Amino acid sequence: MNLLHTTVARIKPQDENIRRQAKDRLDRLTMPHWALGRLLDLALDLAGMTGSLQPPVDRRLIVTMAGDHGVAAEGVSAFPQEVTGQMVANIANGGAGISTLARVANARVQVVDMGAACDLSDLVDSGQILSRRIAPGTANMALGAAMTREQAVRSLEAGIEIANTFAGEADLFGTGEMGIANTTPSSAIVALLADATADQATGCGTGIDDNRRKHKVSVIERALQTNLPDPHDGLDVLAKVGGFEIGGLAGLILGAAALRKPIIIDGFISTAAALLAQSLAPASVDYMIAAHHSIEQGHQLALARLGKKPLLDLDFRLGEGTGAALAMNLVEGAKRLLTEMATFDEAAVSQGK
């Protein structure tokens, strides 16, 4: 608990002095005022996040956290639970969607086992993935708490520790996840923290039909009624209806914010983790970059609660960190506008009136 408390205490808002300096330069770039729109907004944020007019973003790390969920027993996913471990191996071997798009972004992918149901020790022993394993999957949240409060703290602190471990190797973090049925706890978290109903926060996940979606909503409603999570206590929400990988991602976000490093939030599950981070440390939102708007129904509700506009809208619903990977090149573009584009004075170009 001490690491969580000290990390939260270290999270400060963006550097307003550097933001003012960056704004002054961006206002004078050789184009009609703010003609590159939200890319300039992003450049401004990067300066404020890092406290630098030369924000570093070259060393990129996507942390894909894996975990299983007891609520999968309720039939809320189109895929069996063993797919979690199979896809972890696929990512580790470079064959997954995130593996491919990370190569495009010149980013490294680090998979972390937070609590998969299967044995991933061979991948851990070979150095292909890291283990911060808490248990072989959460308990079924439809029947009781998904985890203990102590396990919730452990998951958060594992994510913080990952951020600290890679602080010297990464300028820019991205979030990713792998866990069959993890849209179900994510919908529960969004319903609680974005002040929505279970129906409003629940989509079709891996591609279930409408009848199964209605069943999924009923399972989430049962979990909320059974556990009565306190929406004003992010730790209670995580313990009662969360997941180990979701807690790990929330901790990663807190850790990045404490380090003043930008972190790109991937899709629906990652955004649920971001809501938990916001609940625990509101200033952590200052370091989040929303990668994309997925087609998962509750994602827009979560983004609105964070006050974030996503960079991309490509009808994604995969997770893994795929949207975060694609957004990394936009982040680089924003940084380069701040550091490489000439001002009117530098280029001897006349300004408009």
From Swiss-Prot:
Record EC number: 2.4.2.21
Pfam families per record: DBI_PRT
One record GO biological process: cobalamin biosynthetic process
Catalytic center residues: 320
GO molecular-function terms, A-Z: nicotinate-nucleotide-dimethylbenzimidazole phosphoribosyltransferase activity
Keywords: Cobalamin biosynthesis, Glycosyltransferase, Transferase
Residue ranges of coiled coil: none
Superkingdom: Bacteria
CDD domains assigned: DMB-PRT_CobT (cd02439)
Presence of the UniProt keyword DNA repair in the record: no
SUPFAM superfamilies found in the cross-reference section: Nicotinate mononucleotide:5,6-dimethylbenzimidazole phosphoribosyltransferase (CobT)
Reactions accelerated catalytically: 5,6-dimethylbenzimidazole + nicotinate beta-D-ribonucleotide = alpha-ribazole 5'-phosphate + nicotinate + H(+)
Pathway terms, separated by semicolons: Nucleoside biosynthesis; alpha-ribazole biosynthesis; alpha-ribazole from 5,6-dimethylbenzimidazole: step 1/2
Assigned protein family: Belongs to the CobT family.
Described purpose of this protein according to its UniProt entry: Catalyzes the synthesis of alpha-ribazole-5'-phosphate from nicotinate mononucleotide (NAMN) and 5,6-dimethylbenzimidazole (DMB).
Name of this protein: Nicotinate-nucleotide--dimethylbenzimidazole phosphoribosyltransferase
Gene name of this polypeptide: cobT
